[in-house]
UniProtKB/Swiss-Prot annotation:
Residues annotated as site: Lowers pKa of active site Tyr: K113
PTM-bearing positions, type Phosphoserine: S40
Phosphothreonine, modified sites: T48
Modified residues (N6-succinyllysine): K244
Origin superkingdom: Eukaryota
Residues that hold substrate according to the record: H149, Y268, R271, R367
GO cellular component: Golgi apparatus; mitochondrion; nuclear envelope
Localization annotation: Mitochondrion; Golgi apparatus; Cytoplasm
EC number(s) from the headed UniProt entry: 1.1.1.n11
Source species: Mus musculus
Name listed for the protein in its UniProt record: Aflatoxin B1 aldehyde reductase member 2
Length: 367
């Protein structure tokens, strides 16, 4: 049961404070709870996945353990990491929580990714090396979901897919996922896998939020056609949709965050830090005040409620939102927002207007 899992995480947090190393926890016998359902007659809302990119960077082992525990205690069960996150520290921390990840009776699901960056590739040897290294860090025999983090345009995709099929046959992962691929590449991959009898991808992880909707035009119809679930990352545009930033902030010294003080900061600024984007956020904030008055929800809450109630995500198809965090407090606030109801029509319309303001400079969902 997830309560047992969260207790195991709590014990791991205590251990991490007592010593610098991590220890292997005994696999936990847990039965998966039914997914949370909306009120009678309402559509099933998308699932929530915990993004762990900040574990090992802005969150140490103890804070990470507390966040995983809080996530599990709210009835969620999917964790998302990657080979490259914090140079492997994200996976190491998750592996030390004693969850029994990858065991047959563990209902806490774990996903990781292999990438073609920083000397890596999606050639067979590199894919195998990355996945097997991830399994060692996570202290598990297999992962539930194994993504190709982005296309490797220097490697024939057939080589990559054949290698993935071999690893799947060896029992090293359950489901295959894609991330940051163009819709035509998804169609090509699904066709190749089907014609060769290789494992088919079943999940796509992509960039999607209230002011970044490029996936709606072509990618989502492609995924529906081939039967892939869609997991949305950057639901708050890297934190821009919290409303806490001003456009002029880029010119001064800022605290470490998604947009400042890390190796990916420039990528995130190029992706979202546009003057029109800040104007669009101001428009939504004005609509919130006009519509709700003194009871207006925070911008963060409104952006997440848009994802769960007004986006093109479909809970009945297994779609999900990936929630990252840099602190336990932030996670708890965001989880609370995911449980709130739909927005008033005037605010939904304001989000649509905001999207129209920034659509011309929307970052590509593919790489």
């Amino acid at each position: 049961m997830l309560r047992a899992a969260s207790r195991a995480v709590g014990r791991a947090a205590v251990r991490s404070a007592q010593r610098s190393g991590t220890s292997v926890g005994r696999p936990l016998a847990m039965s998966r709870p039914p997914p949370p359902r909306a009120a009678s007659g309402a559509p099933l809302r998308p699932a929530t996945v915990l993004g762990t990119m900040e574990m090992g960077r802005r969150m140490d082992a103890s804070a990470s353990a507390a966040s995983v525990r809080a996530f599990l205690e709210r009835g969620h069960s999917e964790l998302d990491t990657a080979f490259m996150y914090c140079d492997g520290q994200s996976e190491n921390i998750l592996g030390g929580l004693g969850l029994g990840l990858g065991s047959g009776d563990c209902t806490v699901k774990i996903a990781t990714k292999a990438n073609p960056w920083e000397g890596k590739s999606l050639k067979p040897d590199s894919i195998r090396s990355q996945l097997e290294t991830s399994l060692k860090r996570l202290q598990c025999p297999r992962v539930d979901l194994f993504y190709l983090h982005a296309p490797d345009h220097s490697t024939p995709v057939e080589e990559t897919l054949r290698a993935c099929h071999q690893l799947h046959q060896e029992g090293k992962f359950v489901e295959l996922g894609l991330s940051n691929y163009a819709s035509w590449e998804v169609a090509e991959i699904c066709t190749l896998c089907k014609s060769n009898g290789w494992i088919l991808p079943t999940v796509y992880q992509g960039m999607y939020n209230a002011t970044t909707r490029q996936v709606e035009a072509e990618l989502l119809p492609c995924l529906r056609h081939f039967g892939l679930r869609f997991y949305a990352y950057n639901p708050l545009a890297g934190g821009l949709l919290t409303g806490k930033y001003k456009y002029e902030d880029k010119d001064g010294k800022q605290p470490v965050g998604r947009f400042f003080g890390n190796n990916w900061a420039e990528t995130y600024r190029n992706r979202f830090w546009k003057e029109h984007h800040f104007e669009a956020i101001a428009l939504v904030e004005k609509a919130l005040q006009t519509t709700y008055g003194t009871n207006a929800p925070r911008m963060t809450s409104a952006a997440l409620r848009w994802m769960y109630h007004h986006s093109q995500l479909q809970g009945t198809r297994g779609d999900a939102v990936i929630l990252g965090m840099s602190s336990l407090e932030q996670l708890e606030q965001n989880l609370a927002a995911t449980e709130e109801g739909p927005l008033e029509p005037a605010v939904v319309e304001a989000f649509d207007q905001a999207w129209n303001m920034v659509a011309h400079e929307c970052p590509n969902y593919f790489r």
